[in-house]
């Protein structure tokens, strides 16, 4: 290929990439990194914990540490699990599991988000209030891609329903990318 055609081909490729990025296609594909897996235990808070081995720091997806996930003292709708992602983050999906090797899992939950950790907003889907279906057992993963991405530093899961033969039990992962990365694209 002569130098002129090579240059034209390079320009066409750059224009095509620019069009993909501006349409959001590349951003969506690039913004699905795990955001919870590498967080320290201090990034997790909860309304309560059943014991030290059921503490919120054990609520990471696919982990078996402690008692295999987070469980609060009481199983009621006043419980919550909170994640501090460290910085503003673009969240594109959320995945849950029950507490490993148990009868404890959520069957429905609400997702809240915040930049401050004090003022919370409830995630809402276009066609519903934003209640997410949870799990049907302790170990399968249920992942929900968010119809509208969330930009926030903090996430809070509020259990709404759980297995009738168990209690609230949760392991979680959020997928996305740093907000600063999203803004640069």
Spans of model-derived segments:
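Short intrinsically disordered coil segments
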Residues: 59-61, 126-128, 185
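Short, solvent-exposed aromatic-acidic interface loops
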Residues: 45-50, 99-100, 124-131
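A short, polar/proline- and glycine-enriched secondary-structure boundary/capping micro-motif
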Residues: 57, 107, 133-135, 168
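Extracellular carbohydrate recognition and processing domains
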Residues: 121-145
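Polar, glycosylation-prone regions of secreted, cell-surface, and some intracellular proteins
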Residues: 46-48, 67, 114, 131, ...
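Aromatic, loop-rich ligand-recognition surfaces of beta-strand-rich domains
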Residues: 2-30, 64-123, 146-185
